[in-house]
Amino acid sequence: MRGLPGAFLGSFKTSYGYLSQRLYGVLTEEKYDGRLYPSHIPTSTVQKAILAVGSGVAALKNPYRHDMVAVLGETTGHQTLIKLRDRMRNDPEGSTILLERPRIRLSTLDLSNMSALPDGTLGREYLRFLEENRVTPDTRAEVKFVDNEELAYVMQRYREVHDLLHTLLGMPTNMLGEVAVKWFEAAQTGLPMCILGAALGPLRLSVSRLQLLGQSLGLWALRNGGRARCVLSIYYERRWEQTLDELRHELNIEEPPVSLIASIKNSSSKS
């Protein structure tokens, strides 16, 4: 039985690779017009189920397989994406985002202007987060398996604001910080992949970090994720000069206690 997950994962990788290649091949035919957006790969219900199960197993084995986490999110979150889309439609700023479809990429960021902003502003602290953690928004995969163009954008927006949530919540990119953000996202969005990550992420934490999560950090993340304004409805690109304190207040997000932030950063330095 111990060999079953590995065997299944190997079979999934082969099937997933073939399916992706086959579908991409179909998409390159000039006569094919089934794409709803440039990166779209149309799939049947059965194909989505196969992708969901296989990507779920792969993500469980290695939560850092962002490609598998992405596939899992796209193949399991349709109903939740509808609810998130509706929340955005009912928000003036969110509806503007749905209309204008901004993207958060290096090509759309004015890095020189952001670096000149005062400490404590969203733009300066977001850039600092990217630099200190050596991450870039360009690593966020394009949505492929969502069979609705507008919902695909909602999923893409969710991915591209993830690092902004790290900035807003003051969370590092170590496992504890990622789990805390995932708990916030689970309460905020209800996406199945976020709930799964929130449930299984703690299994990879040490006893001391698990204790910190259970006693204070997790409760803080769940409370704030559940009561905050929809984080997808914020036009962050127009708010770089706004201070984090002001934006947190507007979103109804509590800043984590100073002692808690210190504990998390200390945990990160030991990773």
From Swiss-Prot:
Record key words, sorted: Lyase, Membrane, Metal-binding, Mitochondrion, Mitochondrion inner membrane, Ubiquinone biosynthesis, Zinc
Name the coenzymes or cofactors required. Zn(2+)
Q: Say if the entry is tagged with keyword Transcription regulation.
A: no
Q: What class of enzyme is it?
A: lyase
Q: Does Membrane show up as a keyword for this record?
A: yes
Location comes to: Mitochondrion inner membrane
Amino acids binding Zn(2+): 162-163, 166, 178
Q: What is its main location?
A: mitochondrion
Q: Which PANTHER family match?
A: UBIQUINONE BIOSYNTHESIS PROTEIN, UBIQUINONE BIOSYNTHESIS PROTEIN COQ4 HOMOLOG, MITOCHONDRIAL
Name the family the entry cites: Belongs to the COQ4 family.
* Extra remark: This protein may be expected to contain an N-terminal transit peptide but none has been predicted.
Q: Could you give the subunit structure recorded for this chain?
A: Component of a multi-subunit COQ enzyme complex, composed of at least coq3, coq4, coq5, coq6, coq7 and coq9.
Q: What is this protein called?
A: Ubiquinone biosynthesis protein COQ4 homolog, mitochondrial
Organism for this UniProt entry: Danio rerio
Its organism's taxonomic lineage begins at: Eukaryota, Metazoa, Chordata, Craniata, Vertebrata
Q: Which gene encodes it?
A: coq4
